């Protein structure tokens, strides 16, 4: 078995890693698993910085931490003042993507001019990232973002970043990768800028896929149509490696979460409010390679992160939804349940007050025209669609394929390839936000291994 999560000793010959805009540490975890030492980081969100500090530093007996601070207010000199400048550094990070993403732009546009100005400011956080990276003359730089960054108000952000880095003595490229190609049970497409100082090497190597789409899954191309002109006109874009036909199939939702505890098998049972660190026994021993990888460092037969949302009105709807169903299907089910209850109680539409009360109790209020994809029941035999930070508000977008509920925190973590010993000791909303924003560790590890080859000239 390819033990991706086996304990990897830190290679002291490799540069140390500084993690900017770290979130809960998914990108840094991938580098740590590839043998890099995570020296420190910075993150604005307090819950996320605490989770990163615990999992990447403290639990291993280190005194390092991920600072909770605003990178726009803390100078690079202050941030680096406790580092030995003799040590070579890799600077990694993902400046917040809401300014670039279609979902984020639409949301902020609806909130008025003040938030649009905030959006503009967030769109330039890559400049703070570069300031921090160049301040220490980093040997290697890796920046993650959403593909929409190729056209932010007519500006190709990854091309702009590469221009700056090349003028500062780096070899730089950008590429777009699908996390599913690297063993993540999710078709998450993200953009990466990869750079190395020219006196050290060149970007000859980019991540090699470990998995391929299986026949029943339509490939979510990393070169989506709307990006073609930006790709064609870019000096720095590098085509991702194509998965070999001999590779294992993409990891599916069923592969990913099938051994996790049963939490709510019957829709009318009593809801249980699990605490973040409350442990529950696995449903079964690990059934496949992915499950073994997730559990490899978990020394007990129990797992944390079993919280899921108490959406009492909707449990009966979830129960009747089929795998792959969306909100239109859910609304039709709800209306059927409403008609059944009307017959049972003798209420008709003429009883307007009683009818309205009953409908509000059973039928979700969302438009079937605007919110068709607001609800989606996951399919066991396919990878998940992209997890997003909106999970912190609700989990309708990712409903459990076999149980009548939204996914749990641990199930979301599995779909992002966080191992079971990576702990989210925070509120449910905070955990979902961190997981939805994170770089999947397995994808991050593939990037780290490619950068290691670039540093070492192809010899690992």
From Swiss-Prot:
<dbReference type="Pfam" id="PF00145">
    <property type="entry name" value="DNA_methylase"/>
</dbReference>
<feature type="domain" description="SAM-dependent MTase C5-type">
    <location>
        <begin position="15"/>
        <end position="458"/>
    </location>
</feature>
<keyword id="KW-0238">DNA-binding</keyword>
<keyword id="KW-0808">Transferase</keyword>
<keyword id="KW-0489">Methyltransferase</keyword>
<dbReference type="GO" id="GO:0003886">
    <property type="term" value="F:DNA (cytosine-5-)-methyltransferase activity"/>
</dbReference>
<dbReference type="GO" id="GO:0003677">
    <property type="term" value="F:DNA binding"/>
</dbReference>
<protein>
    <recommendedName>
        <fullName>Putative type II methyltransferase M.OihORF3336P</fullName>
        <ecNumber>2.1.1.37</ecNumber>
    </recommendedName>
</protein>
<dbReference type="InterPro" id="IPR029063">
    <property type="entry name" value="SAM-dependent_MTases_sf"/>
</dbReference>
<keyword id="KW-0680">Restriction system</keyword>
<dbReference type="GO" id="GO:0044027">
    <property type="term" value="P:negative regulation of gene expression via chromosomal CpG island methylation"/>
</dbReference>
<dbReference type="InterPro" id="IPR050390">
    <property type="entry name" value="C5-Methyltransferase"/>
</dbReference>
<comment type="similarity">
    <text>Belongs to the class I-like SAM-binding methyltransferase superfamily. C5-methyltransferase family.</text>
</comment>
<feature type="active site">
    <location>
        <position position="97"/>
    </location>
</feature>
<dbReference type="InterPro" id="IPR001525">
    <property type="entry name" value="C5_MeTfrase"/>
</dbReference>
<dbReference type="InterPro" id="IPR031303">
    <property type="entry name" value="C5_meth_CS"/>
</dbReference>
<dbReference type="GO" id="GO:0032259">
    <property type="term" value="P:methylation"/>
</dbReference>
<comment type="function">
    <text>A methylase, recognizes the double-stranded sequence 5'-ACCGGT-3', methylates C-? on both strands. No endonuclease has been identified for this methylase.</text>
</comment>
<dbReference type="GO" id="GO:0009307">
    <property type="term" value="P:DNA restriction-modification system"/>
</dbReference>
<keyword id="KW-0949">S-adenosyl-L-methionine</keyword>
